A protein has these predicted regions:
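A residue-level signal for conserved active-site and pocket-lining positions in enzyme catalytic cores
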Residues: 5, 28, 68, 106, ...
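Short coil/turn segments at beta-strand junctions that form active-site/ligand-binding loops
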Residues: 1, 59-61, 149, 180
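Loop/turn elements at helix/coil->beta-strand transitions in domains of secreted/extracellular proteins
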Residues: 2, 32-33, 67, 86, ...
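N-terminal anchoring/stem segment of glycosyltransferases
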Residues: 1-59, 112, 190-191, 207-208
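Catalytic core and acceptor-binding pocket of nucleotide-sugar-dependent glycosyltransferases
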Residues: 45-46, 50, 112-208
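Structured loops at beta-to-helix junctions and adjacent beta-edge loops in soluble globular domains
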Residues: 8, 92-93, 109, 186-189
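GT-A fold catalytic core of metal-dependent nucleotide-sugar glycosyltransferases
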Residues: 41-118
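Hydrophobic/aromatic beta-strand patches that form the interior of the parallel beta-sheet core
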Residues: 6, 36, 63-65, 89-90, ...
Length: 208
């Protein structure tokens, strides 16, 4: 199976990318995957996810992983995870009750339905641009009605979020990253300087 890890980088997060991209490269080299660092503004990367279809022309599976996420267990190949569904897989988030999913770590198989979802997200921007978390919120709504293209993996399956904001978002459901988890994703840590420091710390705890 051919697999590519795709991460979005840009000049305004160069310091963050310099910290996290080597972690992703190490993981890909270990498991025979390709690493794609797509250099484009974040807003464009979010709006034009249909461009991922070009990578699906070459790879059987894409793992899209945010720049501010790192792999904390190098031993596990993503394509062997039992929770990965037949088309598109995303994890539950666990930070706040109104946001079910976190799209910072997603797996896309090369299927007609996965490609169609990517096209729909980009072509129907008006459906999600005003939502609280953009098309992440849209996918949460689709998951709630049970669309077969989307598989929702359990909390922390391959995306363990970390947060210090909002202050009232307590870890009441066990969503926070824990020792032994696969991915550390401090998407809710602010300001960005603090997020960087947290990442530096966690990179000393990576299991190999």
């Amino acid at each position: 199976m051919s697999v590519a890890l795709v991460t979005s980088v840009s000049a305004n997060i160069a310091d963050l990318a310099a910290l996290t991209v080597p972690n992703k490269l190490e993981y890909c080299l270990r498991h025979g995957y390709s690493l794609i660092c797509d250099n484009q503004p974040y807003d464009q990367a979010v709006a034009r996810v249909d461009l991922l279809c070009h990578y699906l022309d070459r790879f059987d599976m894409l793992w899209t992983l945010d720049c501010d996420a790192v792999i904390t267990d190098m031993r596990q190949p993503i394509h062997e995870f039992a929770c990965i569904g037949p088309h598109v897989t995303v994890c539950e988030e666990g930070i706040v009750s109104w946001n079910r999913l976190n799209c910072g770590s997603m797996v896309w198989r090369d299927t007609t339905k996965a490609r169609a979802l990517l096209q729909t997200i980009s072509e129907e921007r008006n459906r999600w641009v005003g939502l609280r978390c953009g098309w992440q919120t849209l996918l949460g709504e689709l998951a709630s009605v049970g669309v077969d293209v989307l598989t929702v993996a359990p909390l922390r399956a391959f995306n363990s979020c970390v947060w210090n904001r909002p202050a009232n978002a307590r870890d009441e459901v066990g969503g926070h990253w824990q020792q032994g988890d696969f991915v550390y994703h401090p998407c809710g840590v602010f300001p960005m300087e603090e997020r960087t420091e947290w990442l530096k710390s966690i990179l000393t705890q990576v299991k190999r």
